[in-house]
Amino acid sequence: IRTDKSAYIAGEPLTVTVTLRDEFGNPAFGLTSEVIESYIDSFAVGGATPDSMQWVEQNNGEYTIVWTAWGAEENLVASLKLKTWAAEIKSSLYGIQPGAAAKTQSTIVADKTIYIAGDSITVTVVLKDAQGNFITDGVVQLNEENVQVRNADPIQGNNWVYNGNGQYQRQYMAHFAEANLNAQLKMAGWSDANYSNNYTIKPGEVSPLGSQLRIREVLVVEGADLPVSALLVDDFGNPVDNGLDLLDDAVYLQNVEKKEGEKWRYVGDGIYERTYMAYQEGENLTSFMEIKGWRIYGQPSYNILPFVEVESLSVNGVKFRATDGFPETGFDGAKFTLLLTHNMKNTDYNWTAGIYGINVDSNGEVTLSVLIRSEVTITGKPKNGKGNDVVFKFKIKKWFTSLGASSSNTWDIINTSCSYGQMPSSLELAQRPSGGVVPRKVGTLWGEYGNLKTYGNAFSSTDYWTSTQLMGVHEKFNPETGISELGTGKSSGLCVEYY
């Protein structure tokens, strides 16, 4: 008895040949398969499975039968014993090796269903051929092409290890966070892959490697909002979505404070936003974020400009604070100059009142020419586009009109000369002098503008009648000194309108 080969691959045909002779060595010719079967007491082919039991006569008493190599094993034999024999005969030794890995028999499994980025994923592959034989040389067969572990990479220096029974293991490192992931096994010749159980990779702890603190406005004004964003990611760049508690006290911004009512809010993709408030001017200011002992600096640096506003008004040698309410009075030709905080220059702004009758030149000098009955808003916009708009508002309550030197006449005539309004009293024009000096205060014409003679021809007369009288004598107002005294004869007319 003999086999056609000494080595087989599982699934291959295995041909057994027996030579039947009588005791004198004569070949037994012409035996049918049925006759041979009737003689057989036992017939076995190690590691093989029968395809059929049909014996086929060849020549010289040789008969063959074909089985299929099946179970992988070494040192196998085929054996035969006829009923008349005292012992069996055996073939030479042969071996059966496993066949190619079969998709229907092989598996791939991940050791968990949930990982944290940076965790080790143990992948177990079992390789079997179509006959269920364990494949023992998988270490050389498995590679990055036929085994793919989604969102993970092989751990450096870690290779496939054979554990016996067709089982192989290797460690991978989880990196990109995602749900519904799997590992795939697709050996050569397979039309599609086998898949492991699904698993999820979650982000790891916040890491300084990719996290950022971003200043979203690099130039703001004192008191203005400063928007800030933070990007929180783990070592692998995965967005961290549970960082609100970490950020509460983790961010420092120079010359900036927390804005009341504002908190960090998560906007997605690991990005958090918050609005702070700039409280003090400064240049090249810095910021940082410090979490669990590590620190990263915000980018870019930023500047806080001073909040510029009108600090005071310069009026004919006197300054009024912007909060004093100047001007309450006005006349055609009245002038005053805006003085800004932080020693800022008026020439660095483009000034406008946006209404006819109010002119503002490049030096911030305001000239009134027409009565404006509503509130006036003067705006200065920075020429370089940096900083806040400077805004000054005022409303004229009393508008004075000089009738000119040519109007000089008696009080009775002047008293009826005001087409609009009426003749003002002395105290509407100026307060009484103290120590010979008329006070410069808001609320009276001379108190606000001083020597009215300095305003061109607006007050060309020497004096003007007032409605104030003492013992039947009316007072005359001196536009140069601001002093009113009892007078007779003629004087010029001055009218006031109220708004």
Regions found by a protein language model. Name each.
Residues 13-15, 20-55, 119-121, 127-158, ...:
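Short flexible loop/turn segments that cap and initiate beta-strands
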Residues 428-480, 497-498:
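An exposed tryptophan-centered "aromatic clamp" motif
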Residues 377-381, 385, 391-398, 465, ...:
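Short, structured beta-strand segments at or near domain termini in extracellular proteins/domains
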Residues 75-82, 180-187, 284-292, 373-384:
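A short beta-strand micro-motif common to beta-rich folds, especially ectodomain repeats
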Residues 57-65, 162-170, 266-274, 361-365:
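Aromatic sugar-binding surface patches on proteins
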Residues 1-29, 42, 72-134, 186-239, ...:
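Short S/T/G/P-enriched beta-strand
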Residues 65-71, 170-176, 274-280, 366-370:
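Short, hydrophobic beta-strand segments
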Residues 312-313, 317-334, 339-346, 352-423, ...:
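Extracellular adhesion/carbohydrate-recognition regions
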